Regions:
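Active-site-adjacent structural elements in enzyme catalytic cores
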Residues: 1-215
Length: 215
């Protein structure tokens, strides 16, 4: 039976974050608010949990799960060949609605799907998400919806779709933004905008003037 906590209530927030952290450590799924849409998350290093996440969404391994982190410093242990331009994007837009696709450390013991040696990583601008990520470490997080359905902007919508496949729901009210993050590939010499989202190409070009845009 799924448990739900109102993170706008101080007592519920404390209890909910504790229960969510425990659930993640047990390899279970949680739903959490972010600065874009609600996400469904699992321990990034627990293969079975990531598999459960993909199954709950009805999503295949060909659509690997992004990773959310609670601090830019966490990148040092996750990625390799991270350029100066990539760090400048981090400095300018994190925490926030920018996802960076980077090469992950080959020694990492995780299975996020068919990533081809890369990871899509982001630090969200949401206090509840950051508090949970700081407590449990990197999480595999995808939008908390069934594949093909709209990404949820509130906890009700997420729970209506995902039900008891999730152990803990953290209800932070409506999300402050309903536009997905922008995605930039920083594995290339010149970063490539793969998806224009909450951050426009014009804003990104203030940091990376030569930014290319995918067709």
């Amino acid at each position: 039976m799924a448990r739900r906590y109102d993170t706008n209530d101080a007592t519920d927030r404390t209890t909910g974050l504790r229960e969510a952290a425990s659930a993640v450590r047990r390899g279970e799924l949680v739903v959490l608010p972010t600065d874009t849409v609600y996400g469904i998350g699992a321990d990034a290093f627990t293969k079975e949990a990531v598999g459960d996440l993909l199954e709950a969404k009805g999503r295949g391994r060909n659509m690997p799960t992004p990773v959310l982190i609670g601090s830019p410093n966490t990148l040092h242990g996750l990625v390799t060949d991270f350029s100066e331009l990539a760090w400048e994007l981090v400095d300018a837009f994190w925490p926030g609605a920018l996802t960076l696709v980077a090469r992950h450390q080959p020694s990492l013991q995780w299975d996020l799907g068919d990533t081809r040696g890369t990871v899509a990583v982001r630090m969200p601008l949401h206090p509840v998400a950051i508090e949970l990520l700081t407590e449990v470490g990197p999480m595999a997080v995808s939008s908390a919806n069934l594949t093909g359905h709209p990404a949820p902007e509130d906890c009700d919508a997420a729970q209506n779709m995902l039900g008891d496949s999730v152990s803990v729901y953290l209800d932070g009210g409506p999300t402050p933004g309903n536009v997905a993050s922008s995605i930039v590939d920083v594995t290339r010499e010149v970063p490539l905008l793969l998806r224009a989202g909450a951050i426009s190409a014009e804003e990104l070009r203030k940091v990376v003037p030569d930014l290319e845009v995918a067709n």
